[in-house]
Amino acid sequence: MQWASVLLLAGLCSLSQGQYDEDSHWWIQYLRNQQSTYYDPYDPYPYEPSEPYPYGVEEGPAYAYGAPPPPEPRDCPQECDCPPNFPTAMYCDNRNLKYLPFVPSRMKYVYFQNNQISAIQEGVFDNATGLLWVALHGNQITSDKVGRKVFSKLRHLERLYLDHNNLTRMPGPLPRSLRELHLDHNQISRVPNNALEGLENLTALYLHHNEIQEVGSSMRGLRSLILLDLSYNHLRRVPDGLPSALEQLYLEHNNVYTVPDSYFRGSPKLLYVRLSHNSLTNNGLATNTFNSSSLLELDLSYNQLQKIPPVNTNLENLYLQGNRINEFSISSFCTVVDVMNFSKLQVLRLDGNEIKRSAMPVDAPLCLRLANLIEI
């Protein structure tokens, strides 16, 4: 009997110790489960999401102890998802929607991409004027079915995605708060001078893959613009008055045949310029057109140039392949060639021209001493 009491007491101690060990690690299981359901509110929009819903990708209980996660609020449209752990986002993408559903007032991020929406009716966002991001790309929206003031009331809107639609005109008016505007892959033919009026906070403008023939002076007031993409259009002239803050300019695959003298002087921060696949000739370029000290990369490939245009010694990458260049002028890179004066050029592409490697002048290695790739 005495031994039985001892064994019973030992068993109880062992059971108590085992329960204590399990409970002492409950917080680890809690953190693991919390991490599995975590969703980053500042990365709510992968442009090409690999999963239809980036939240809740791991299955399993959300909590090791306590109540389950709260259900979706009742104000969420039945066609959409409103994750409880990110209450200001509404996901209505890839649902074959033909209309825009009601948007609750608490929403900051709404995603309607990849549907069959053809209209943005007036007042559809009046209940949610605090929206920051609106994604409407990959739909069938036409300009005549976009309410004129549908976006102007969104005074906090920062990003607007209207690319890959059927727009033929610039939307507007747009709110001053806008920072990114995506209008690429539409059928827009022109940008009126007042189309972007008041967008002083805009930093990136995507208008590539449209049918734009002219933009006039519509870019003049965009004092914060850093990136301008007008590639794959029908432009014959470069935009008038580039913004002073501009760093990246993409104009490839147009019909541009001339660039004015000192055109880039008003943009002292400009780093990258792409003008490939245009109709540029030496007659359409002034002597100092590309002599900008800020430029790091210049792409003039696949034009109709016969001579290498003069560039600044600070330029690092120059692409001239696919032209009609028939001579190698070292003065295009170095006005004076000596030990102290040389070009910072690292990449020079001259292949696909009418020039041979033997045409390189003897002082080329001294001028282009930093080059690690010269293709002829």
UniProtKB/Swiss-Prot annotation:
Signal sequence, start to end: 1-18
Upper taxonomic lineage: Eukaryota, Metazoa, Chordata, Craniata, Vertebrata
Sites bearing Sulfotyrosine, chain numbering: Y20, Y38, Y53, Y55, Y63, Y65
Pfam families: LRR_1, LRR_8, LRRNT
Alphabetical UniProt keywords: Disulfide bond, Extracellular matrix, Glycoprotein, Leucine-rich repeat, Proteoglycan, Pyrrolidone carboxylic acid, Repeat, Secreted, Signal, Sulfation
Sequence ranges of the LRR repeats: 106-127, 130-151, 156-176, 177-198, 201-222, 224-245, 246-266, 269-289, 294-315, 316-335, 344-367
Residues covered by the LRRNT domain: 67-105
Primary localization class, coarse: secreted
Compartments where found: Secreted, Extracellular space, Extracellular matrix
Protein name in the entry: Fibromodulin
Keyword Signal annotated: yes
Gene Ontology cellular component list: extracellular region
Carbohydrate-modified residues: N127, N166, N201, N291, N341
Family of this protein: Belongs to the small leucine-rich proteoglycan (SLRP) family. SLRP class II subfamily.
Classification via SMART domains: LRR_BAC, LRR_TYP, LRRNT
Cystine pairings recorded for this chain: C334-C367
Function (record text): Affects the rate of fibrils formation. May have a primary role in collagen fibrillogenesis.
Subunit structure: Binds to type I and type II collagen.
Keyword Signal attributed: yes
Expression tissues: Highest levels observed in knee epiphysis, in calvarial and diaphyseal bone, in nasal and costal cartilage, in the eye, and in bladder. In mature knee joint it is mostly present in the proliferating zone of growth plate. It is also observed in ligaments, especially at insertion sites, in the junction between meniscus and joint capsule, in the perimysium of skeletal muscle and in the periosteum.
Entry-annotated residues carrying Pyrrolidone carboxylic acid: Q19
Post-translational modification: Binds keratan sulfate chains. Sulfated on tyrosine residue(s).
